[in-house]
Amino acid sequence: MARVCQVTGKRPMSGNKRSHAMNATKRWFAPNIHSHRFWVASKKRFVALRLSTKGIRLIDKFGIEYFFTKIYPKK
């Protein structure tokens, strides 16, 4: 699976690692992704999401129902 947050859309990005002598070598910066289950009261079930820590904090702030409609739109 891709290392992408399902709420914020954060994904790995490339950059430079710098040594003490300021030599640049390419490297990847990966987001802090966690698998987390949330209880969705309207559906009466758990939903498992892969989120960055920022995404978990946003769900704690606004609630899972707010993001649930964006992640799983009605068909």
Swiss-Prot record:
Q: Which HAMAP family match?
A: Ribosomal_bL28 (MF_00373)
Q: Does the keyword Ribosomal protein apply?
A: yes
Which family does this protein fall into?
Belongs to the bacterial ribosomal protein bL28 family.
Task: Cite the source lineage.
Answer: Bacteria, Pseudomonadati, Pseudomonadota, Gammaproteobacteria, Enterobacterales
Specify whether Ribosomal protein is a keyword of the entry. yes
Q: Which organism's genome codes for this protein?
A: Blochmanniella pennsylvanica (strain BPEN)
Annotated signal sequence is: none
Please state what the protein is called.
Large ribosomal subunit protein bL28
Q: Which InterPro entries match?
A: Bacterial_rp_bL28, Ribosomal_bL28, Ribosomal_bL28/bL31-like_sf, Ribosomal_bL28_bact-type, Ribosomal_bL28_sf
